[in-house]
A protein has these predicted regions:
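Short acidic, glycine/proline-rich loop/turn micro-motifs
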Residues: 79-83, 148-154
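An aromatic- and histidine-rich active-site surface loop
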Residues: 84-100, 110-147
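A conserved catalytic-core segment of Leloir-type glycosyltransferases
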Residues: 39-102
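Membrane-proximal helix-turn-helix segments that form the acceptor-binding/catalytic region
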Residues: 100, 126-132, 159-178
Length: 186
């Protein structure tokens, strides 16, 4: 089985999300799947593209037998909502460049999409499910925009909340399958 994992984070980045996605990719590989990962140039948790990756729009590498396709993103750890949105949208846009550059997309049996960030997951669902007709599974690690409301970063019922809530429903409605990190998420 050929699997593409789309994630905003991946090793050598540090933290829970990169560790989970890296472990998932390596676990699937150990079970005999052919796994590719589509991700950003590494920049987390510092918010700066790592040394060895700077000055590039993309980089393909093989890590533990997994093809990793990395694309530029506007890297930031700013709390500023506008800068965070630009970061997410920059990678969401790069997904489209990948799709039309890499001809083997039609060969993927499954595409696993990490959510959040919602703009990336929404773009990936549109691209891989709607345009290329691939079976898509969404790995939910946090409920957005609910988490943002609970953290006080967003107001329920505001325009931004409504946009994120619409994207969230769109992702869930269009995925072929959904799995999460806990019972509360499912």
């Amino acid at each position: 089985m050929k699997i593409l994992i789309v994630s905003f984070y991946y090793s050598p980045e540090l933290g829970a999300a990169p560790s989970r996605i890296t472990n998932m990719a390596e676990g699937l590989k150990s079970q005999g799947a052919e796994v590719d990962v589509l991700t950003c140039l590494p920049n987390y948790p510092q918010g700066q593209i790592f040394e060895g990756y700077r000055g590039r729009l993309s980089k393909k590498e093989k890590i533990n037998g997994i093809n990793v396709y990395r694309y530029w993103t506007y890297a930031t750890v700013s709390k500023n909502p506008f800068k965070r949105a630009v970061s997410m949208m920059s990678f969401a846009t790069m997904l489209w460049l990948f799709a039309f550059k890499i001809k083997k997309i039609q060969g993927y049996d499954r595409v696993i999409i990490q959510s959040p960030p919602l703009p990336v997951a929404g773009s990936a669902i549109t691209l891989f499910k709607k345009i290329f007709g691939r079976k898509t599974l969404v790995n939910i690690s946090d409920l957005w925009p609910l988490s943002a409301v609970e953290l006080g970063a967003m107001r329920e019922g505001g325009k931004i909340y409504d946009i994120f809530a619409w994207i969230e429903r769109y992702i869930y409605r269009n995925a072929d399958g959904i799995f999460g990190q806990s019972e509360e998420i499912i």
